[in-house]
């Protein structure tokens, strides 16, 4: 598989998560949706693994795979959704998410001996700046007051949970470089989604989530989430982590908010201004520097 093709496909798929979350919001509570999505992907890839006779890891390794999935998807998405529901503005959550590639790059130095050259760190800085430019209009309107009050209104515990979600996906990304990397991708994705499903179930029970209103939009969003987000995108991301540096792989996430802004413009008629387009260009330049610096 070409690394460039895998990177492009991953970004295109992963960015749709923002759109799916918005589309299914009126029809299902977030963790119920995530439980169905993770469980569906786990079942799908278990069937694929069995049909293709993929080698399953030893039972003693299953716990590691479950933990990897719980960190990479379960805690990350469940905690971030909860933080937004508690009053943390979505734009602030997205800005916190932009720090994840930076955290991964910093931690990859002592853990794996990965070292980004100066151009790579410059690319990371550009990536964060690009995301900030893309999100700037949403953080400032309808008036900076609303967003500022939303951020200020979020409790310290809510902010802590949001930071925990970013720490979770960072840990999950780095953990993919450990012993779990030896497991066949098909069985790894099945087990890791099972781990994420356990977390989503715990969140749904703890928060008393019960809302599920069957609708074509919900079923379409669930099918896309099963096959393309927790399936295809995770396969590509784990492959990129296994076959390259953790910092270079996670730097691709800088492009998710800009692409989501484009998708919001096409699908929902959201405003897309010159500042956001400039942010897209800056983020793209940053990812190019981070990924292909030597």
Regions found by a protein language model. Name each.
Residues 1-35, 41, 142-178, 198-199:
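Glycine-/small-residue-enriched transmembrane alpha-helix faces in small-molecule transporters
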Residues 7, 60-69, 116-129, 183-193:
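Cytoplasmic-side transmembrane-helix entry/capping segments in multi-pass membrane proteins
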Residues 11, 34-36, 92-99, 174-198, ...:
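Helix-helix packing/entry segments at the starts of transmembrane helices
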Residues 13, 17-18, 46-97, 133, ...:
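Specific transmembrane alpha-helical segments of multi-pass solute transporters/efflux pumps
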Residues 19-28, 82-86, 135-154, 205-222, ...:
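Membrane-interface helix termini and inter-helical loops of multi-pass transporters
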Residues 26-75, 101-103, 107-108, 167-172, ...:
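Transmembrane alpha-helices of multi-pass small-molecule transport proteins
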Residues 44-56, 84, 100-125, 258-278:
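C-terminal transmembrane-helix exit sites in multi-pass transporters
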Residues 45, 107, 116-139, 147, ...:
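Hydrophobic transmembrane alpha-helices of multi-pass small-molecule transport proteins
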């Amino acid at each position: 598989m070409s690394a460039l093709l895998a990177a492009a496909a991953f970004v295109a798929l992963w960015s749709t998560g923002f759109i799916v979350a918005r589309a299914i919001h009126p029809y299902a509570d977030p963790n119920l949706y995530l439980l169905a999505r993770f469980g569906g992907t786990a079942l799908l890839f278990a069937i694929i693994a069995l049909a293709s006779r993929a080698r399953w890891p030893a039972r003693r390794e299953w716990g590691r795979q479950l933990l990897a999935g719980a960190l990479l998807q379960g805690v990350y998405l469940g905690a971030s959704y909860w933080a937004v529901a508690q009053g943390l503005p979505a734009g602030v959550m997205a800005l916190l998410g932009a720090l994840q590639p930076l955290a991964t790059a910093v931690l990859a130095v002592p853990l794996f001996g990965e070292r980004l050259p100066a151009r790579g760190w410059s690319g990371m800085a550009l990536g964060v700046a690009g995301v900030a430019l893309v999100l700037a209009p949403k953080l400032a309107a309808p008036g900076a007051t609303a967003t500022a009050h939303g951020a200020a209104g979020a409790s310290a515990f809510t902010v802590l949970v949001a930071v925990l979600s970013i720490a979770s996906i960072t840990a999950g990304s780095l953990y993919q470089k450990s012993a779990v990397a030896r497991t066949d991708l098909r069985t790894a994705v099945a087990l890791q989604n099972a781990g994420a499903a356990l977390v989503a179930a715990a969140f749904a029970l703890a928060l008393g989530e019960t809302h599920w209103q069957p609708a074509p939009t919900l079923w379409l969003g669930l099918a896309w989430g099963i096959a393309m987000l927790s399936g295809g995108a995770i396969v590509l991301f784990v492959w990129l982590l296994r076959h390259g540096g953790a910092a270079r792989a996670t730097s691709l996430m800088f492009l998710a908010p800009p692409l989501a802004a484009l998708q919001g413009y096409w699908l929902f008629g959201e405003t897309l201004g010159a500042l956001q387009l400039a942010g897209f260009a800056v983020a793209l330049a940053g990812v190019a520097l981070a990924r292909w610096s030597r």
